[in-house]
Amino acid sequence: ALGGAAHVTAAAALGHVAVALIARRVPLHLWSYLSTQAAHIVVIAAVVVWMPDAFAHGLWAAYAATLHPLAILLGGVIAATLMGGPAVGLLMAPWRAAAQIEGLDNAGRIIGLMERALIYLMVMIGEPTGIGFLIAAKSILRFETASRDQKASEYVIIGTLASFGWALAWGFAAQSLIAMLR
């Protein structure tokens, strides 16, 4: 599929396995998580630098011009949504017990995933102003909690801002990388 570049694929796989094995030996904290994710991105970047024409040969040759932006778009979705959940969760861990937020099991995780996906989408379609409506809607829905419980309110605000910031950063990063390909 990569035009005979099995060694590049093997190097990428070994790089990711090495990062994962090292990460298992380090206590899980926000900085160790972010470092691990950065290391995975470095592995991908190293493969791209090592063999920038990987899609120019083999089965994917006819689609090479489309695949690069699509790979960045999908990588950005994964980074903004799935990588963002654990990052925000680890950031918020010290305050979780004090906030004592009651609600459905995993609802915060699902809400965060959906809000990061919406923010990423709004950035990618060139409508980041729509994020203001998302902030307003979430504020209205959380108004009662905010007026009742200051700790829970602060917990939600910090988590929301971290989640929004994460998605915005990945959205604008993906948008910039795609623009560089043009």
Locate predicted features.
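Transmembrane helix-loop-helix
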Residues: 2-15
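Active-site beta-strand/loop microenvironment that shapes enzyme catalytic pockets
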Residues: 12, 122, 132
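Transmembrane alpha-helix boundary/anchor motif
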Residues: 13, 17, 82, 86, ...
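Interhelical loop and helix-boundary elements at the membrane-water interface
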Residues: 19-49, 53-124, 141-166
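Re-entrant/interfacial helical elements at transmembrane boundaries that shape
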Residues: 132-139
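Juxtamembrane boundary at the C-terminal end of a transmembrane helix
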Residues: 170-182
